[in-house]
Regions:
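PRPP-associated nucleotide enzymes
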Residues: 1-309, 371-378, 395-398
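A short catalytic or substrate-binding loop motif that flags glycine-/basic-rich loops and adjacent residues
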Residues: 150-151, 307-312, 438, 445-448
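Residue-level marker for buried hydrophobic side chains located in beta-strands
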Residues: 200-201, 443-445, 463
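Gly/Thr-rich phosphate-binding beta-strand-loop-beta motif of the actin/hexokinase/Hsp70
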Residues: 204, 446-453
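Conserved ATP-binding subdomain of kinase catalytic cores across diverse folds
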Residues: 297-429, 460, 467-529
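An alpha-helical support segment within catalytic cores of ATP-dependent transferases
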Residues: 396-447, 457-459, 552-572
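Conserved protein kinase catalytic/activation segment
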Residues: 453-465
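Helix-rich C-terminal or lid/interface subdomains of diverse kinases
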Residues: 487, 501-572
């Protein structure tokens, strides 16, 4: 199934470096404390992206990773930022080392493509955890650090700083997602291999196959490096997933691969201290990640919606000063700050809960004693007001999948999930309707309009939960026309035609422009196919959580039934308005 996608941004390299240099200069004027540390980490993440973009441009030009002069020049200030980050963290945010004077190096490409480091944005990967893990390594020889781009670029510089190693080498594995390889220029390869070195490979993961770590290890082993001289620094302590080959599994089992988890890095006492800056002394913290929040919304487990526990953001229910707050990971490297600005816009419009602020990657939002929303007559009213406000207030911060890409995703998922006959019906549907790309008005769409994402308060009002970042999630969709969310509400609440008409009208009025009906018709089967794929992947990955797998399989059945009915023309099963 096609579900995941990567986020990329192409920028003018010198302009980005100049802006980043100003940000670094501003850090020097900040007082000690967690906010200065946050700013250092934000600059560290941003400069890591720039180095990644330069390295990728060089690889594209030469067909192999070679460590261009521009990349090597930028690794020096990245190392200096790493040292400042370490000094700040180790001194409880009191001290920092000298900050670099950042300038554009010679040989810099005019434009570079920056990849979003997914671990920083989605999976609570903190660079300090890698520093702590690096200190647990037992090395036999001089350390040489290899960072796997994207996120491994900055992390490798940080680990090299911890180990007192020379500047790292960065690589971009290529090939089939489950069987990747790396290629280095002859000069870089010659400088890399030496018998007295202990190699440290840095990346997030491992994922389904562990192929990125494996690609680097295989390259080294093929050139005579012993396995016991190759260590890994991953983001979690688990094994590679079900697509890993036997060699990768054996290599992983025997390697040094220390991990420091977020819970170890951020014990409750440390998190409580940070939060006290926003909400006062903390009385209690309860972890409600992995779907545990459902116990506070639903009376019975039988009513719990499906979740994918390992993909949920870390979140805590916090009590302070007699009030309760939801503290949720929103991303480091400036991600949480950007989402805070969005939350304040939507709260001012009266459609989401109050957000108090952010503290080093966590948003602090007022916890509401609210219940689940049923299939009530007012769904078009509260959903239309919310979607219209979103369309009016939130232009897209980045791009999203084109209609052609959505159609290709849907075609594939339908073929895999429902068979060739229904896939052929979708192909005819696309030909008949066309893909009116020129009519798409991209906004920062919600992309999660499920039943359980809405909160009904005791006074009858309904607010939208989890409304801040799914347009930039680790999936294909991205920013879309508001018709995508309209389709989502119609599908998730199974709206009758008259209710769907009301939703369309209210959304258009609140947005200031009508909902495009042709787009709505085009996007509805695409929405269903995407959710079918996501539910199927969730069900397939939940072998260790059988009760969650049952819920995901029920979602698969629901989306498959709706999609099949829509495309094969079974009357009375699809409620889109005419």
């Amino acid at each position: 199934m096609i579900v995941y996608g990567d986020r990329a941004e192409t920028v003018a390299s010198r302009e980005r470096i100049a802006a980043l240099a100003a940000d670094i200069d501003a850090i020097a004027t900040m007082p000690p404390g967690i906010w200065r540390h946050d700013a250092i980490v934000t600059a560290f993440v941003a400069l890591g992206q720039v180095v990644q973009g330069v390295a990728d441009a060089d690889r594209e030009a030469h067909g192999a990773d070679g460590g261009s002069d521009a990349e090597r020049s930028l690794l020096a200030p990245l190392t200096a930022l790493s040292q400042a980050l370490l000094a700040s963290w180790d001194s409880d945010f009191g001290d920092i080392t000298a900050l670099p004077a950042l300038t554009a190096p010679l040989g810099l490409p005019d434009r570079i493509t920056l990849r979003l480091p997914e671990g920083y944005a989605f999976y609570a990967v903190y660079p300090e955890a890698y520093a702590a893990a690096a200190r647990l390594l037992r090395l036999d020889g001089t350390a040489l650090v290899i960072g796997v781009r994207s996120i491994g670029t900055g992390l490798a510089a940080l680990v090299a700083a911890v180990l007192g190693a020379p500047a790292p080498v960065t690589v971009r594995p290529i090939g089939h997602p489950f069987d990747r390889t790396i290629a280095l220029t002859p000069k870089t390869e010659t400088g890399l291999i030496a018998s007295d070195r202990h190699y440290v490979v840095v990346d997030e993961g491992p994922g389904l196959s562990g192929s990125s770590f494996a690609a680097v290890a295989a390259f080294l082993e093929e050139r005579g490096v012993r396995r016991d001289r190759i260590a890994f620094l991953p983001s979690h302590g688990g094994e590679p997933g079900g697509q890993a080959n036997p060699r990768t599994i054996a290599r992983w089992a025997g390697a040094q691969r220390p991990v420091v988890t977020m819970n170890t890095l951020l014990p409750r006492e440390r998190l409580s201290e940070w939060l006290s800056h926003l909400i006062g002394p903390v009385e209690e913290i309860e972890d409600v990640s992995g779907g545990a929040w459902r116990a506070y919304v639903y009376g019975s487990e039988a009513d719990w919606p499906a979740v994918q526990p390992w993909q949920e953001r870390h979140k805590f229910l916090v009590r302070a000063g007699g009030e309760r707050w939801l503290v949720k990971f929103a991303g480091i490297g400036g991600e949480a700050t950007r989402k805070l600005e969005r939350a304040r816009l939507l709260h001012a419009a009266g459609v989401v809960p109050e957000v108090r602020g952010q503290v080093y990657g966590f948003l602090v939002e007022r916890w509401l004693d609210a219940g689940a929303v049923g299939d009530n007559d007012d769904v078009p009213d509260f959903a239309g007001r919310y979607l219209g406000a979103r369309a009016r207030l939130l232009p897209p911060p980045g791009g999203g999948a084109s209609l052609a890409e959505l159609a290709a995703m849907a075609q594939y998922n339908i073929s895999v999930g429902l068979g060739d006959e229904v896939a052929a019906a979708f192909a005819r549907f696309v030909i008949e309707l066309g893909a009116p790309e020129s009519r798409v008005r991209r906004i920062a769409t919600d992309n999660r309009c499920d039943h359980h994402e809405w909160l009904r308060l005791s006074d009858g009002r309904v607010l939208k939960a989890d409304a801040l970042d799914h347009d930039a999630a680790h999936d294909l969709i991205g920013a879309q026309d508001i018709a995508w969310d309209v389709a989502g509400v119609i599908v998730e609440f199974d709206l009758a035609p008259t209710a769907a008409e009301r939703l369309i009208a209210i959304t258009g009025e609140a947005a200031g422009h009508p909902v495009d009906r042709d787009l709505l018709h085009f996007l509805t089967p695409c929405y269903l196919a995407f959710r079918l794929g996501a539910a199927q992947l969730a069900a397939d990955s939940l072998g260790g959580w059988p009760e969650e797998a049952v819920r995901s399989r029920a979602a698969v059945s629901r989306y498959a039934g709706r999609l099949s009915a829509l495309l094969t023309g079974q009357a009375g099963t699809e409620n889109l308005p005419a």
